[in-house]
Amino acid sequence: MSRIQTRFAALKREGRGALIPFIEAGDPDAETSQTLLHGLPAAGADLIEIGVPFTDPMADGPTIQRAGRRALEAGATLAKTLAMVETFRQQDKDTPIILMGYLNPIETYGHERFCVDAAAVGVDGLIIVDLPTEEADLILPFATANGLDVIRLVAPTTDDARLPHVLNGSSGFVYYVSITGITGTVTASAEQLAQNMPRLRRVTDLPVAIGFGIRNPAQAAEAVRQGDAAIVASALIDTLAETLDDGRATDRTVPAVLDQVRQLAEAVRSARLSARGA
């Protein structure tokens, strides 16, 4: 089994959902970003999503767009993101790492070369936001050949007829975009999640991770009651940004983000226990 499959299987045996925090590679600088990445597992991250900075992140809200700009201004690149994962793997062999980004940097790097190099440094999965379902074969054969899970995004607007087509070739988990629009804006209600989860379960056995709009422990807990994982991105980046001094990291930056991850992890770990006890 892949690291992603192994982690979700272990969590299923424990009867709990996963917390997947997001950080932007190189934000606000390479050293701080690396330190933060190393601290996430001990803070309660079950899997980690790393954003690859890009100049035109169309699905990202203002918070993550600003994070990307900070990272790019500090010299972040796709190659440096891979190096960041390689350094992480020297200390952590178990926590799954998913890269989330856009197709253009991968095309510039080279589809096959990217998949070979990503697997070699210890990346486990890919989320390519703007990869059309009809063009999945640009990446899928190379990813599969190198043991990388390709994680597809589905939304409330993805109709039942299209769902199997969108999920064809998907592995690892399904990223359920709980709202329509950009990241970090509004939040789906428990009722909306409850309506949409059953139709996903009918067409896939993959774990379902819920993202976009999850900002606090209560929302993360609700996500794992309805799905299998909560992805938290903009809220963590906001916390990071609040600690910066003129765009630069301070001694509060890493501790503040890790403290927030601990609070989210505690809520996620207790969510199903409290639901059973209710």
Curated annotation (Swiss-Prot):
Pathway: Amino-acid biosynthesis; L-tryptophan biosynthesis; L-tryptophan from chorismate: step 5/5. The keyword Amino-acid biosynthesis applies. It is an enzyme of class 4 (lyase). GO terms for cellular component: cytosol. It catalyses: (1S,2R)-1-C-(indol-3-yl)glycerol 3-phosphate + L-serine = D-glyceraldehyde 3-phosphate + L-tryptophan + H2O. Its EC number is 4.2.1.20. It holds the Pfam family Trp_syntA. Keywords: Amino-acid biosynthesis, Aromatic amino acid biosynthesis, Lyase, Tryptophan biosynthesis. It comes from the Bacteria. InterPro entries: Aldolase_TIM, RibuloseP-bd_barrel, Trp_synthase_alpha_AS, Trp_synthase_suA. The active site is at residues 49, 60. One of its GO terms (molecular function) is tryptophan synthase activity. SUPFAM superfamilies: Ribulose-phoshate binding barrel. PROSITE patterns: TRP_SYNTHASE_ALPHA. Tetramer of two alpha and two beta chains. The alpha subunit is responsible for the aldol cleavage of indoleglycerol phosphate to indole and glyceraldehyde 3-phosphate. Belongs to the TrpA family. This is Tryptophan synthase alpha chain. It comes from Granulibacter bethesdensis (strain ATCC BAA-1260 / CGDNIH1).
